UniProtKB/Swiss-Prot annotation:
PANTHER family cross-referenced by the UniProt entry: IMMUNOGLOBULIN HEAVY CHAIN
One GO term (biological process): immunoglobulin mediated immune response
PROSITE patterns xrefs: IG_LIKE
GO CC annotations on file: extracellular region; immunoglobulin complex
Lineage: Eukaryota, Metazoa, Chordata, Craniata, Vertebrata
UniProt-listed InterPro entries: Ig-like_dom, Ig-like_dom_sf, Ig-like_fold, Ig_sub, Ig_V-set, IgHV
Keyword list, A-Z: Adaptive immunity, Immunity, Immunoglobulin
Ig-like domain residues: 1-112
Record protein name field: Ig heavy chain V region GOM
Species, as recorded: Canis lupus familiaris
């Protein structure tokens, strides 16, 4: 059974930082290009960041570029998202998923509010 478990979400003030984690089990993690996506209240899914395993390349949505950093540790079957300079508009449930969206976790809630 494939499981993706996200954690690290919290209530944080604007300008603060959080580090999200996603731990995978049941898949060969090193074979997957992974991404973080988010769903803000009342809105659709938005791709936030991706990590291309073969190239060790990263890409970011314009809204988070320069503030968020994605990283992947295949030895720990883990994906991370370092989030700095958080804004109210970053409030959302954050999910990790393979590039083709084969699997989903339960998500972790990030709330940015003063």
């Amino acid at each position: 059974e494939v499981q993706l478990v996200e954690s690290g979400g919290d209530l944080v003030k604007p300008g603060g930082s959080l580090r999200l984690s996603c731990v995978a089990s049941g898949i060969t993690f090193s074979g997957y290009d992974m991404q973080w996506v988010r769903q803000a209240p009342g809105k659709g899914l938005q791709k936030v960041a991706y990590f291309n395993d073969a190239l060790s390349a990263q890409g970011y949505a314009d809204a988070v570029k320069g503030r968020f950093t994605i990283s992947k540790d295949n030895a720990k079957d883990s994906l991370y998202l370092q989030m700095n300079s958080l804004r109210a508009e970053d409030t959302a449930v954050y999910y990790c998923a393979p590039w083709q969206f084969e699997y989903w976790g339960q998500g972790t809630l990030v709330t940015v509010s003063s």
